[in-house]
Amino acid sequence: MVDIADEMKPADKVRNFQINFGPQHPAAHGVLRLVLELDGEVVERVDPHIGLLHRGTEKLIEAKTYLQAVPYFDRLDYCAPMNQEHAFCLAAEKLLGIEVPKRGQLIRVLYSEIGRLLSHLLNVTTFAMDVGALTPPLWGFEEREKLMIFYERASGSRMHAAYFRPGGVHQDLPRALVEDIGAFCDPFLKLLDDLDGLVTENRIFKQRTVDIGVVSLEDALAWGFSGVMVRGSGAAWDLRRAQPYECYSELDFDIPIGKHGDCYDRYVVRMEEMRQSTKIMKQCVERLLKEAGPVSTTDNKIVPPKRGEMKRSMEALIHHFKLYTEGFHVPAGDVYAAVEAPKGEFGVYLVSDGTNKPYRCKIRAPGFAHLQAMDFLCRGHMLADVSAVLGSLDIVFGEVDR
């Protein structure tokens, strides 16, 4: 009798199985398509396919004035819109050589930290949902709603605020709003404790996240990781402390780091970062209630005049008209400005040719560097761990595809 195994041609032998994960998968966090090669249930290879949300943002910015370019940045990482505007404004201000007044800096820092809470709340709670916990997102979204109302009261919009402008912020915050943000902080810390009690020591959650997607510090740096991905692996690298911008150097906060660089450590770092952000917000609120002053530079060639001035002064009217039609001219040169966005180092490389529009605006999205390591992080893990690793990377496709 002939042995069937001998008769089988090489092509008929057992092949690895290929499946598509996404782009409509609920755990894909947007329009990610992963082509997975599986050996049984073990992941052999991960191939991310991106570009499904590509809108040509960098090219569109080249045809807009510096002021018109600001709203494009809200639409990159749409979980924390103002943090992106911040990097662009810092880059433009470096080229213009202008200083933002202290009150403007405090408002920017306050809203950047609100953005960090918005982003981390979304990530931590949906990450818990990806591995099977259904309660956290319901709690998290309730808090995000309160924070979005603070966005709305400052700028008129819940998400795409366009509130940070080159030179400062669009307008001052009403005292009642600052007081309400202060009143939000302590109950929010109580909610974080509840969330901690529900998820952090949960046996099933730990089984799904401990020793999954481990990345050593050397690997993290070699892949170009930043933000939580580096801090989770044990490096206390935070641009707010390492290269302070605005008034971060005057504020008191700690930088949490992980030990093992796995999904669980990254989750714990994000939880602690929310506490530190709340600490920063309290300090900003305290100073905003004490100190008055302008919220943007007084140079009317860059920042539009107040409405009252326009009714009295012809010159103010001319400034307003010129700013909103032609825009301001930025001296020729190139500059790189980066902020510690919730996802990592968000950088803008801005090249000016001396006109009213950017010659080139290169956006450095942190999620792009993190997503490229999916193959490295998932290889050898089970299929179910892919969504855990992806959730711990905290990826948003607005910024990855741009």
Curated annotation (Swiss-Prot):
Its EC number(s): 7.1.1.-
Protein's cellular compartments: Cell inner membrane
Signal peptide: none
Record keywords, A-Z: Cell inner membrane, Cell membrane, Membrane, NAD, Quinone, Translocase, Transport, Ubiquinone
Catalytic activity: a quinone + NADH + 5 H(+)(in) = a quinol + NAD(+) + 4 H(+)(out)
InterPro entries the UniProt entry points to: NADH_Q_OxRdtase_suD, NADH_UbQ_OxRdtase_49kDa_CS, NDH1_su_D/H, NiFe-Hase_large
Membrane topology, record value: Peripheral membrane protein
First-listed, main subcellular location of the protein, grouped into a coarse class: membrane
Family statement drawn from the similarity comment of this UniProt entry: Belongs to the complex I 49 kDa subunit family.
HAMAP family cross-referenced by the UniProt entry: NDH1_NuoD
NCBIfam families, per database record: NuoD, PRK06075.1
Name of the featured protein: NADH-quinone oxidoreductase subunit D
Source species of the chain: Xanthobacter autotrophicus (strain ATCC BAA-1158 / Py2)
